[in-house]
From Swiss-Prot:
Motif (Nuclear localization signal): 709-717
Transmembrane domains' residue ranges: none
GO cellular component, one term: nucleus
Sequence positions bearing N-acetylserine: S2
The encoding gene: Matr3
Function noted in UniProt: May play a role in transcription or may interact with other nuclear matrix proteins to form the internal fibrogranular network. In association with the SFPQ-NONO heteromer may play a role in nuclear retention of defective RNAs. Plays a role in the regulation of DNA virus-mediated innate immune response by assembling into the HDP-RNP complex, a complex that serves as a platform for IRF3 phosphorylation and subsequent innate immune response activation through the cGAS-STING pathway.
Subcellular location: Nucleus matrix
Protein name: Matrin-3
Listed PROSITE patterns: RRM, ZF_MATRIN
């Protein structure tokens, strides 16, 4: 190469130019590059070499005209046959800088590869002063350029420079349109000679890299339009074999710098970006592959790959950079030239999940289609785009799009709270696998107000910032087809059930928990799960529930030394009977029966209530069977009709019954600390030959289930008396246990149809029993407080279940010692043994 430089220098001296060796060598390289039409920024082998030649000809002064340059090239070619054969410039005439010629793309690629240069390296080399470039230090300069290129990584071209040869066939504007659009150019290349002076004769130390890069970027619009004038259908055949080389070069440079580095490489520009940038900005489908994204400088080879690319975060980030580089460009401004073909936007596969949001829907625009993918003028500044910050067409959408949130408990509530202050929410949709949500407001103004607010104020979900913008892809959210008549109600959707967690396992009554929620409103129902240390409290209105949740978020709720976590239950909307109609009917029967029977004058109202309730109680054996199914299996139905009539109290969500085995067991377990609050003794009998009466079924309740039944009692008119008795039962568990004894006796009588009599008849039967001799196994001595009796009736279940008293205990010692030593247990056992003795006597008589 040194010999070539010397020969070139001799040739130039013979013409009288007096140029030194380095100037002649660089001038020859620039002329060769000009003849081969090597690209600078777009990667196309067609345009831009004239500018490169002028930049690389450092040996020539600014006054050197084009004819002088040709003379220098001619003398150099006569003294070097090798270079003449390589560059093929011996017979070429003067080439004006603004003219366009096709070059041999194969030779151009080989020359660049032999020098180790790329299009960017040529531009960088042009910035060096001529006195610092010599044949000796030229290799070191090129190595420095390569090293700097590797460190910096590839830059975004945005149609400016650095484009590789992997561009698709250029879709060019017709010449007549191109001539009309030339008013966008400030001057032709011939008239812009003075503007080249800062590039040709500048002090290297006084100019920054950005300013030089800015000067080079000024040529892009002209060169892009000039390049699009020449249509060549055989372009792919000439350049397809260069794909791997330039792509590998792109890989060496790195796939993309960080956002801060990208921003540092560009200055703000006026006007609009080139048409190719605008097309790729909108994500329009290319008409041919392979296609090179003019924004990301990345080749794609199929529709699927193109869709994946424009949906990626890198493309979205660089689209945002394009908007920052051209602040005056408004993609959504519907004045001037538009994107014509209304069907092109329908073909777009870009949902734009990144920072730009989804693309706008299809719309009809006027004007003939000029560009390859729409009506795109050459460099006009008013074009449509998916820029969500603009407000050109937002009036047609009322769907707020929320993105990049983190999932957690009560996610729906957190999302709806973002937009609820701005208006009524009509519908919403939360995606399962993607962290995106769509919330439809009642009016467009409400949706726009929410979006405008969160453009200046950060939107937080679980304390983390999220992105909120107006969805232009979705204008409405359709109602589910299966529920066309279902009216969406946000308040009903959220429910009014408060979830309390981290409660103590024991040592408190149900009323103590209810007092936590009483200050915020009326309590309709509740279920307490001591085994799980949690409780569900249903308030009368959602506002009451929200008031408690909001207050506890600001000030922690402490209960018996524990910080109780309070939130709105998303799983359960309300607390209802599993079979609501049957449960209400039974409760009505319970009320009517309680009023129809006249108790003895000596009996208290609690005794009367217990007896009337007990008349609906099923047989002990049947109660045992159903208790096992409820405690162990948690199933909704059992094998017999009587069990199906039992309206167990369970939690119910909006769509289905959401209760599992553990929850059902927890419901039963919670009754130990407050005694038999149900007053409906579901006795378990070891005997299986007791008869059943279907009409006398009753609701078996544990303490939490009894509390749940309050909701249904309140829904039935004229049963306030029973509610008051239940509330009294919550405050005094021992009293409830005592009141249950007569109920057990009545239930035992109800098991046998022959003994379906009044309380007076029951008393006479008890007197008649004493006239007969009772076997020893049915005898029981006087009550002793510390002597447990009937331990065999306590069996292990999910806890320890007393079949006589229908109570669960988690501790065996408490069940067999404390409970079996209690007076209610003793009385029930005594009456149960008397019943067995009476049955035996009747059998002997028959």
């Amino acid at each position: 190469m040194s010999k070539s430089f010397q020969q070139s220098s001799l040739g130039r001296d013979s013409q009288g130019h007096g140029r030194d060796l380095s100037a002649a060598g660089i001038g020859l390289l620039a002329a060769a590059t000009q003849s081969l039409s090597m690209p600078a920024s777009l990667g196309r082998m067609n345009q831009g070499t004239a500018r490169l030649a002028s930049l690389m000809n450092l040996g020539m002064s600014s006054s050197l005209n084009q004819q002088g340059a040709h003379s220098a090239l001619s003398s150099a070619s006569t003294s070097s046959h090798n270079l003449q054969s390589i560059f093929n410039i011996g017979s070429r005439g003067p080439l004006p800088l603004s003219s366009q010629h096709r070059g041999d793309t194969d030779q151009a690629s080989n020359i660049l590869a032999s020098f180790g240069l790329s299009a960017r390296d040529l531009d960088e080399l042009s910035r060096y002063p001529e006195d610092k470039i010599t044949p000796e230090n030229l290799p070191q300069i090129l190595l420095q350029l390569k090293r700097r290129r590797t460190e910096e990584g590839p830059t975004l071209s945005y149609g400016r420079d650095g484009r590789s040869a992997t561009r698709e066939p250029p879709y060019r504007v017709p010449r007549d349109d191109w001539e009309e659009k030339r008013h966008f150019r400030r001057d032709s290349f011939d008239d812009r000679g003075p503007s080249l002076n800062p590039v040709l004769d500048y002090d290297h130390g006084s100019r920054s890299q950005e300013s030089g890069y800015y000067d080079r970027m000024d040529y892009e619009d002209d060169r892009l339009r000039d390049g699009e004038r020449c249509r060549d259908d055989s372009f792919f055949g000439e350049t397809s074999h260069n794909y791997h080389k330039f792509d590998s070069e792109y890989e060496r440079m790195g796939r993309g710098p960080g956002p801060l580095q990208e921003r540092s490489l560009f200055e703000k520009k006026r006007g609009a970006p080139p048409s190719s940038n605008i097309e790729d900005f909108h994500g329009l489908l290319p008409k041919g592959y392979p296609h090179l994204c003019s924004i990301c400088d990345l080749p794609v080879h199929s529709n699927k790959e193109w869709s994946q690319h424009i949906n990626g975060a890198s493309h979205s980030r660089r689209c945002q950079l394009l908007l920052e580089i051209y602040p005056e460009w408004n993609p959504d401004n519907d004045t001037g030239h538009t994107m014509g073909d209304p069907f092109m936007l329908q073909q777009s596969t870009n949902p734009a999940p990144g920072i730009l949001g989804p693309p706008p829907p299809s719309f009809h625009l006027g004007g003939p289609a000029v560009g390859p993918r729409g009506n795109l003028g050459a460099g006009n500044g008013n074009l449509q785009g998916p820029r969500h910050m603009q407000k050109g067409r937002v009036e047609t959408s009322r769907v707020v799009h929320i993105m990049d949130f983190q999932r957690g408990k009560n996610l729906r509530y957190q999302l709806l709270q973002l937009v609820e202050p701005f208006g009524v929410i009509s519908n919403h949709l939360i995606l399962n696998k993607i962290n995106e949500a769509f919330i439809e407001m009642a009016t467009t103004e409400d949706a726009q107000a929410a979006v405008d607010y969160y453009t200046t104020t950060p939107a937080l979900v679980f304390g983390k910032p999220v992105r909120v913008h107006l969805s232009q892809k979705y204008k409405r959210i359709k109602k589910p087809e299966g529920k066309p008549d279902q009216k969406f109600d946000q308040k009903q959707e959220l429910g009014r059930v408060i979830h309390l967690s981290n409660l103590p396992h024991s040592g408190y009554s149900d009323s103590a928990v209810l007092k936590l929620a009483e200050p915020y409103g009326k309590i309709k129902n509740y279920i307490l799960m001591r085994m799980k240390s949690q409780a569900f409290i249903e308030m009368e209105t959602r506002e009451d529930a929200m008031a408690m949740v909001d207050h506890c978020l600001k000030k922690a709720l402490w209960f018996q030394g524990r910080c109780v976590k309070v939130d709105l239950s998303e799983k359960y909307k309300k607390l209802v009977l599993r079979i609501p109609n049957r449960g209400i009917d039974l409760l009505k029967k319970d009320k009517s029966r309680k009023r129809s029977y006249s108790p003895d004058g000596k009996e208290s109202p609690s005794d009367k209530k217990s007896k009337t309730d007990a008349q609906k109680t099923e047989s002990p054996a049947e109660g045992k069977e159903q208790e096992e199914k409820s405690g162990e299996d948690g199933e909704k139905d059992t094998k017999d009709d009587q069990t199906e009539q039992e309206p167990s109290m369970l939690l119910e969500s909006e769509d289905e019954l959401l209760v599992d085995e553990e929850e059902a067991a927890a419901l039963l377990e919670s009754g130990s600390s407050v005694g038999d609050e149900t007053d409906l003794a579901n006795l378990g009998d070891v005997s299986s030959d007791g008869k059943k009466e279907p009409s006398d079924k009753a609701v078996k309740k544990d303490p939490s289930a009894s509390a749940t039944s309050k909701k249904k009692l309140k829904k039935v008119d004229k049963i306030e008396e029973l509610d008051q008795e239940n509330e009294a039962a919550l405050e005094n568990g021992i009293k409830n246990e005592e009141n249950t004894e007569p109920g057990a006796e009545s239930a035992e009588n109800a098991d046998d149809p022959n003994k379906d009599t009044s309380e007076n008849a029951d008393g006479q039967n008890d007197e008649n029993k004493e006239d007969y001799t009772i076997p020893d196994e049915y005898r029981i001595g006087p009550y002793q407080p510390n002597v447990p009796v009937g331990i065999d009736y306590v069996i292990p279940k999910t806890g320890f279940y007393c079949k006589l008293c229908s109570l669960f205990y988690t501790n065996e010692e408490v069940a067999k010692n404390t409970h079996c030593s209690s007076l209610p247990h003793y009385q029930k056992l005594k009456k149960f043994l008397n019943k067995l003795a009476e049955e035996r006597r009747q059998k002997k008589e028959t």
